[in-house]
Each structure stands twice: as C-alpha cells, then as structure tokens.
Amino acid sequence: MIFQKNVKNYWKDSYNKLSKLNQLITRSNLLGSDLKVTNFGGGNTSSKIQVKDPITKKMETILYVKGSGGDLGSIKEDGFASLYQEKFNSLKNIYRGFNFEDEMVSYYPMCT
C-alpha cells in the first residue's frame, strides 16, 4: 500500500505486553505524535476491551472512546470515555432517527 510506504511504524513488540487499555493509550499517542497521520490535537481512537466489573465481578465489554477536544498525542486514561458496550448497544431501542440524534447524548452517562 502507498500509505505504508509513507508512514513509519513506531509500534514495538514490547507494547504487546501492555494491558489492552495501555495498548490503546500507546497506540493513540503514537498516532497523535505523527503529524503525517493526524493534525495536532486531532484524531480519534477507540477500542472494545474485556474488563472485570469491580462491582459485579462479571466480565464486561467496555468501549473506550477518545473524548472530544483531547490531544491524541498526549492522551492518558482519563481522556477516554468508557461505555458499557451492552448498555450502549441498547440505545438503539430508543433511537428515533437522524433528526433526534442530539437527544441521545443525554443517555450516554447511563452507559458508563
């Protein structure tokens, strides 16, 4: 691919030993620090990660999404919103269509 010829791969094999969340953070920082890939302060990353819920002790799929306005090149864990995937997927049951998308934002905290 042409893209691969022009973009350096900064990923190190040692990063594979990091937790999935720390891999997301590292991947985000690497992408955000390469201005061939993203503009300063721009870019978005997300990942679905299996996590043990500290309250229920059940394994849950959590969707980590880079918050708006954060710098991808320096983002840390607190720069990601975390949403329970199952709850987030349930929002489709109350979705009323494109003209009502703004009202969905108020439901996001119910998915955290």
Q: What is the role of each PLM region?
A:
Residues L18-T112:
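N-terminal low-complexity or amphipathic/hydrophobic leaders
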Residues M1-Q23:
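Flexible inter-domain linker/hinge segments
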